[in-house]
Amino acid sequence: MKQVEIIGYSRANLGKKGSKDLRLDSNVPCVLYGGESQLHFHVPMFLFRDIIYTGVACTVLLNLEGKQYKCVVQEVQFHPINEMLLHVDFLLLDDKKQVKMNIPVKFEGTSPGVIKGGKLVQKVATLQVKAFPKDLPDVILADISQLELAKSVKVGDIKTNNYTILNAKSIPVCTVTIPRSLKQEEAAAAKK
């Protein structure tokens, strides 16, 4: 799993006003959970570019005023209108404890249904996984090489390696839909 290093700075003002002032200075208020006590800090907003806005999951090496913590992003809060990053929660990793994390889904292979004119529709962007930190994948690969028209790949169809997917097995990850034009062609052929 990819590891990204970011630098954080402790913060004393924990209220609404302190958080608002940090955001005005292009900083994001953050909290690190999982240790003996919670650590409140802030990180410059541009440092989250390599963590949140990528298509792969990663661990974070947090440098907090000289001390280093290995952690993962647990929760991210965005502003509902302008989608500005408001708050980030980190979870401290322990090699002896399993951790839950949302991992992005990618597709491998070429679907015969897409070749026949269908459209591949992704239903789920991430899946929740439980694993030891060393076994966390960057992405979850879903094989679509056998996916025909009007069929779907479900969570239960995905092969896992040293991790458990916590989502329900019956949830579709992707589906090959039949476009309207293809349905009309089939209906016209059936009438003849």
UniProtKB/Swiss-Prot annotation:
Cite the entry's keywords alphabetically: Ribonucleoprotein, Ribosomal protein, RNA-binding, rRNA-binding
Q: Source organism's superkingdom?
A: Bacteria
A GO MF label? structural constituent of ribosome
UniProt xrefs under Pfam families = Ribosomal_L25p, Ribosomal_TL5_C
GO BP term, pick one: translation
User: Which InterPro entries does the UniProt record give?
Assistant: Rbsml_bL25/Gln-tRNA_synth_N (IPR020056), Ribosomal_bL25/Gln-tRNA_synth (IPR011035), Ribosomal_bL25_b-dom (IPR020057), Ribosomal_bL25_C (IPR037121), Ribosomal_bL25_long (IPR001021), Ribosomal_L25_dom (IPR029751), Ribosomal_uL5_bac-type (IPR020930)
Note whether Transit peptide occurs among the keywords: no
Subunit (UniProt): Part of the 50S ribosomal subunit; part of the 5S rRNA/L5/L18/L25 subcomplex. Contacts the 5S rRNA. Binds to the 5S rRNA independently of L5 and L18.
Protein purpose? This is one of the proteins that binds to the 5S RNA in the ribosome where it forms part of the central protuberance.
Quote the NCBIfam families the UniProt record gives.
bL25_bact_ctc (TIGR00731), PRK05618.2-2 (NF004132)
Name the UniProt record assigns to this protein? Large ribosomal subunit protein bL25
